[in-house]
């Protein structure tokens, strides 16, 4: 029964993405993602929702504003094709992303939890997290390990960036607090 539910969710999600793509409002629609990046982003969101269905949770909804913020944070890495950039460059992108994200978060009454978001080390360099696993089993394992998707999260912002042939990702899940 769980497999049937998972398959149904994946089929419905895929059908919805096809319709939205045709209408110009798809996940990543209007963004600067390449077709390969959009496909990786869709695969990640589908895997997250399949995981949630297996836990008897509602599928999580992608929020366009939150995803735009994630895309802004990954943009300096994509533009330079590096997994390491100056902390100053990343802080600038992070400020821009937070300025976009914060009003939406307040409007929706949500708190957020980041996953695989770039971080700055003691040398003041910003680094990307792990690349997106290529194998489905590894992707499922990563999603289960992140833990926060087990919670009552209702929205997600996510983006991916292809850097030197590898897909890197960042996402932020949001749950209602008010």
Give the positions of each predicted feature.
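Bacterial N-terminal signal peptides that target proteins for export
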Residues: 1-11
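Enrichment for repetitive, rod-forming helical segments
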Residues: 10-13, 59
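Generic surface-pattern signal
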Residues: 13, 53, 75, 79-82, ...
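C-terminal motif of bacterial Sec signal peptides marking the signal peptidase cleavage site
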Residues: 19-22
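Bacterial signal peptide processing site
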Residues: 24-27
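Short, well-ordered surface patches within globular domains
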Residues: 29-102, 156
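A well-ordered secondary-structure block
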Residues: 91-178
């Amino acid at each position: 029964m769980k497999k049937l539910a998972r398959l149904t969710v994946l089929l419905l999600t895929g059908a919805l993405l096809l319709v939205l793509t045709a209408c110009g409002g798809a996940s990543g629609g209007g963004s600067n993602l390449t077709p390969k990046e959009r496909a990786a982003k869709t695969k990640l969101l589908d895997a997250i929702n399949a995981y949630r269905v297996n836990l008897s949770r509602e599928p999580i909804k992608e929020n366009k504003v939150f995803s735009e913020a994630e895309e802004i944070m990954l943009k300096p890495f994509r533009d330079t094709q590096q997994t390491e950039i100056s902390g100053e460059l990343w802080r600038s992108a992070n400020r821009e992303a937070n300025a976009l994200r914060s009003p939406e978060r307040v409007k929706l009454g949500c708190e957020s939890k980041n996953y695989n978001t770039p971080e700055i080390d003691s040398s003041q360099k910003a680094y990307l997290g792990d690349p997106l696993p290529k194998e489905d089993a590894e992707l499922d394992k990563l999603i289960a390990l992140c833990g926060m998707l087990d919670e009552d999260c209702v929205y997600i912002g996510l983006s991916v960036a292809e850097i030197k042939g590898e897909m890197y990702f960042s996402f932020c899940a949001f749950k209602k607090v008010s």
